[in-house]
Amino acid sequence: MTPEQPYIGYKSTFGKKDKHRIVLIPWFTDFLSPLIPALAQLAGYKFVNCPKTSKTSAEIGLRYGNNEVCYPATLVLGDLIAELQTGKYDLDNVAVAITQTGGQCRATNYLGMIKQGLKNAGFECVPTIAVTLGGGVHQNEQKGFKLPIMKILNIGVNALFFGDALFQMFSAAIVREKSTGETQKFFDFYLEKAKEITLENKPQKLLSLMEQAVNDFNSIEIVDKKLQKVGLIGEIFVKYNNYGQVHITEWLRAHNCEVLVPPMTSFFLQSFVNQQINRENGIKRTNILTLKLLPLLYKFLDKRQKKFEKRLEKSHFFHPHESIFKLAQYAKEILDLSNQFGEGWLIAGEVANFARQGVNRIVCIQPFGCIANHIVAKGIERRLKQHYPDLNLLFLDIDGGMAEVNLHNRLHFLIDE
């Protein structure tokens, strides 16, 4: 392959004439995926969520992919191919899209694997888009796909904070509700309202909706019972995708555990710490414009996050979460902050944050063979326990061929001690 002879293994591209195409996206998580098509519509694209990840996704992903890759990639590929195989879409008017961060792990190779999988399944004619939010990630750039970041920034930020806050209230209420289904009813209702507001591009209305949601979740009649608190951390996809995590969260709730999951916003905000650390350590150069803009952008995001937290504090089971720089401070006691592959130092920071709040039972999940997260998760177990002796850490590798009974047995050891 040379500049004169570019790679032509997958010929379909998304050009300017293709903006009319329906863009299929894999299901990620219940509190954010429903809002993504609305954000995309504001940006001028028609995104459609695939159905929630299922056993069919895993089987199809393995059939057309490679079982040596990251398990989430197998599920993502399976989601996309399964939906294309339904026959609901004109292949001349459809494309697929996935997100890319450009990190130092197998996830960076999703694109190549998904293109090969689509080709194996007979969908080589379907263009593949990589959705990124900048940061120097240049993968699979397509002339017809450009996100108007400034147009959707305000509403996008509020949608993410809203989803995080809604999920926190949902997680606290569903394990305590007296009338089964009431919590889910409110969760679905407010996600639907959030979709409507997102389409209107009214960021301030999401704050008002948050206040209303807090009042309604507080009105749920609860059962007064003793619950164990269990923290759930790990790789972003298996942490937030119900099938990807083998429904661990549901299993724990069924065994009288309140599952505490860190907000997804932390995953994105850690880049502000990373930029600073990389500059200080001479790992990456930062131009003067970026140096000036980064603190302003963080200040904007932090101020917006605090507005949502102020409203969330009024919920009955509010669980505070520290700022990303405070988490970095905690993590620095455990490992060098230059460890940024996989979830990076964020895992150490989240474990420390839970431990300082008295949550000592923690499940850390990652895809089987995820070397990046093994290093920054299980690799720091001894040091974590030196700092926090009361910790009870359980590390679980998730894979399509794992026996769920073995996983449940290990979870019993965590909660039955």
Where are these regions (language model features)?
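An N-terminal assembly and electron-transfer interface module characteristic of large anaerobic redox
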Residues: M1-E417
